[in-house]
Amino acid sequence: MQQRGGKESSMREFLITTDNTADLPYSYYKENHIEYMYLTYTMDGVTYGKENELPPKEFYARMRGGSMPTTSQVNAETAKEVWRPYLEQGMEVLHLAFSSGLSGSYNSTRLAAEELKEEHPEYKIKVVDSLCASLGEGMFVCKAVELRKAGKTMEETAAWLEEHKLNFCHVFTVDDLHHLHRGGRVSKMTAVLGTMINIKPLLHVDDEGHLIPLDKVRGRKKSLASLVDMMDARLGSYRGKKDAVFISHGDCESDAQYVADLVRERYGIENILINTIGATIGTHAGPGTVALFFMGDKR
């Protein structure tokens, strides 16, 4: 980090923070000096967080066995604890929050930033509502890191992200409708009948950051292939740019690899990141979820 004072102060590297809902490999956070806040979850009477989280395979195995976890949002005090040591050193902080359409974490962190700036007007904190989830939020974070490495200031980085956030596209499918029913996304009748006749829903995250069912198809392979068709309909001016594509999954890596292969075959894109969906989003989407994230003209 450059020294404070004069022109150098405005160009010093800033801290990027986010939520564990970005579903990036933890090694990425460490390598790129990113702090993340953990949305805790409770399963079988035990609350899990950053220090004691379950391995993904165990988490999903318990869900398949009937365990029904619940999640909580980041609170303002947690955000302050993460930011304060850096702010006291004179660093600027850019927080990229989990979609406000899916969690109250954005409002909690926005409140925390306002309270800290009231106490210390010299603190520079910017909170951006990503309107993204899972590796869509992860892609949002990666873009911020890319801009920071290119020498952009915190303000410039935040402005770019605000302008382009709706170009971060999310499409996905689930294998078990009952988890969507639990979250209020589909009716009980739809879940029961859909399961009986092997119906798989296709969903996306809309311009308000909400999770919205779009269509349904019969059969798992068709639902996975439909994700790439949905991508094709959204690429627009991004077609041919071969931007990175991210894929997250609820403990079904072979299905994620199948989607990755379809993307490679159709677009020649080789820069594809695959990672497991963390417990916070996995609680609501369930095992067997596959999500595809990419840059496009519209969500």
Identify the residue ranges that each predicted region occupies.
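Glycine/charged-rich beta-loop-alpha catalytic/anionic-binding loops adjacent to active sites
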Residues: 62, 90-95, 118-128, 274
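Generic alpha-helical hydrophobic packing signal
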Residues: 15, 80, 84, 121-124, ...
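Mixed-charge interfacial surface used for oligomerization/domain docking
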Residues: 12-15, 21-35, 40, 105, ...
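Glycine-rich phosphate- or other oxyanion-binding loops that anchor nucleotides, phosphorylated ligands
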Residues: 65-102, 107-111, 158
